[in-house]
Regions:
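Sequence/fold signature of self-assembling virion shell proteins
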Residues: 2-32, 40, 45-52, 72-79, ...
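Generic alpha-helical secondary structure
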Residues: 102, 106, 161, 224-227, ...
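Short N-terminal amphipathic alpha-helices
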Residues: 46-48, 57-62
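Glycine-rich, mobile lid/loop segments that gate access to catalytic sites or pores
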Residues: 218-240, 248-261
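Short helix/loop capping segments that flank catalytic or ligand/cofactor-binding pockets
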Residues: 56-59, 87, 259-262, 346
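Small/polar beta-strand repeat architecture
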Residues: 137-163, 169-226
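Long, contiguous amphipathic alpha-helices that act as assembly "spine/axial" helices in icosahedral shell
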Residues: 48, 73-133, 239-256, 291, ...
Length: 362
């Protein structure tokens, strides 16, 4: 019976994962390009590898010197753990439920897991590259930036703690940086937009009186007459970052999704793809994005929605059942099922540019 219980537990895990993959949009918008084994004993670490850009050489027939491509490695920490633990009144009935992937038990377990992982992945809006956000920018006053420390001293500014994590760029900067800490209404600290190396600021000195931009500091309002323009802005962010045109996605809550369906410009694109909208909440295809509707998008209409767009290369996701079995209840008659699911996600620095965010409300 012990072996049978183990086999039933393994089948439960396999079928729940099948339902998870059928329903989770997280699986559709991420990749699993990692190396290593997930064991579940602790916070497992697997490696995410990526290569830097390659270059073409002019060939003249002479001997060539081989380039050394850069290989970047990030660690994905599988530190999210969720457990199933419930009593089994009848082992025979439980085994029957487990044998049928369409049973309410398996469907409920798989869909709950999908919602949980979707919420986790859609909460990674802080891993969007600085400069890839659409919202209401903050540009009031002027600033000076100190060399090395990245301390920003504002004049006529009203910085807030909510600005931490947003992109920052002052006149004189050649790229975007990220707000690291908030000190006061006139003082913040910025850093390079990197997570896989030690925090540093390499943007140099910016003299006082410089104009600047803090991207998407507050939410902006969208309507059916303006939503298409903001989608094109997201597309432009990815285009400028040279993100591949294929496998692009956009995830919106129903409030935004229904607004999109009212937009005159979007009706032809959505109608063309309407045959497949039931699968995983696919709303349609717009401006090169496969659009998903999902209520796990971070935020609400009061605080603002963190609508994410991107390419499958943006985020690496690992999900696994590491324990699954049936055991005798201690101190009582009967049995119980106990299973452990672990997951984690990582956006490595090289791929932050493959994500974009629209911070909005209706």
């Amino acid at each position: 019976m012990a072996d049978f219980g183990t086999n039933v537990g393994e089948k439960f895990a396999r079928n729940v994962l099948q339902v998870f993959f059928e329903n989770s949009i997280a699986d559709s918008i991420t990749n699993n390009d990692y190396e290593g084994e997930i064991k579940g004993g602790g916070a497992d670490r697997v490696n995410v590898l990526t290569f830097g850009s390659l270059s073409l050489k002019d060939y003249t027939g002479a001997a060539m010197t081989a380039d050394t491509p850069s290989e970047n490695e990030g660690q994905l920490i599988v530190n999210q753990k969720k457990a199933y633990y419930f009593k089994i009144e009848s082992f025979a009935k439980f085994a029957s439920y487990v044998d049928n992937p369409e049973s309410s038990l398996i469907q409920n377990a798989g869909k709950v897991l999908a919602e949980t992982v979707d919420k986790y992945v859609l909460g990674l809006y802080g891993d969007v590259a600085a400069g890839n956000r659409i919202g209401t920018d903050y540009v009031t006053g002027t600033v000076a930036v100190a060399t090395t420390t990245g301390v920003v001293t504002g004049t006529g500014t009203t910085f807030t703690s909510a600005m931490v994590g947003r992109g920052f760029k002052a006149t004189g900067h050649t790229k975007w940086y990220r707000i690291k800490t908030y000190t006061s209404a006139t003082s913040i600290t910025i850093e390079d937009d990197l997570d896989d190396v030690a925090s540093a600021y390499t943007g140099g000195d910016i003299a006082g009186g410089a104009s600047y931009t803090i991207e998407a500091a507050t939410k902006l309002q969208v309507a059916n007459t303006t939503i298409y323009g903001y989608l094109l802005d997201l597309k432009t962010k990815l285009d400028q970052a040279k993100v591949p045109m294929t496998d692009r996605w956009l995830v919106v809550p129903s409030k935004i999704g229904n607004l999109m369906l009212k937009a005159t410009e979007l009706i032809p694109a959505v109608s063309t793809a309407y045959e497949n909208v039931v699968t995983k909440g696919i709303l349609g295809y717009v401006s090169g994005f496969k659009v998903y509707q999902n209520e796990q998008v971070t935020g609400d209409n009061s605080a603002g929605y963190r609508v994410l767009a991107g390419h499958k290369s943006w985020c690496t996701l690992a999900v696994a059942f590491t324990e699954s079995g049936v055991e005798d209840l201690i101190g009582a008659f009967g049995k119980a099922y106990k299973g452990l699911t672990v997951y984690g996600a990582k956006v490595i620095d090289e791929r932050r540019k493959a994500g974009a965010e629209l911070f909005c409300y209706v």
